[in-house]
Amino acid sequence: MKNIIFISNLMFLFSCGFYSMAGSIPPHIKSIAIPLMDNQTAEFGLAEDITDGILDEFNEAGILRVTDENSAHSILRGTIKKVSEGPYTYSKQESVSEYRYKIDVKIDWYDVSQEKNLLEGTYSGFGAYGLSGDIGSDGIDNDNDGKIDAEDDDEFGEPRAFATRVAVRKIAEDILNDIMTTW
């Protein structure tokens, strides 16, 4: 019986124990630069918010070393193309009870040594917010995590600003996932 458990553990270790998403990135790319996004919208501070969100995702994942453009193996450039905001849900009285805030960003991931784009695409993220003024008690799942108000410890702050953070986080996660899995 001990031999069966030992062999099972060995099989597990050698089958999936050493899997790494970093193996799907071209092997010569070890670092990435993420300069400030261009902003083609009237939203003040959005370029900084999205750039910081993407930097946070890459630093947390630790897949590529984040560095400056002069020493990077790859560069992730982006342009905020559009911000839209409109009614998302309505009450029984047919008045707007929730708004949807959406951001569209065009991204290019460039390989410096090969002088070519590795990934191009448009990414969108959205967040929802109500009109109550307090997202901690508005009865809305503002960040789409399945938790509402008192159940959700990260729902606080000004509603529209929180919706922006949710949209930025979604965009950053999607970009990182595509970079890690496209190859």
Where do the language-model regions lie?
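Bacterial N-terminal signal peptides
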Residues: 5-15
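A structural "domain/chain start" motif
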Residues: 13-72, 85, 113-116, 160, ...
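Acidic-leaning, charged glycine-interspersed low-complexity segments
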Residues: 131-133, 145, 165-166, 172
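Acidic carboxylate motifs that coordinate Ca2+ or other divalent cations, activating on Asp/Glu
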Residues: 138-145, 149
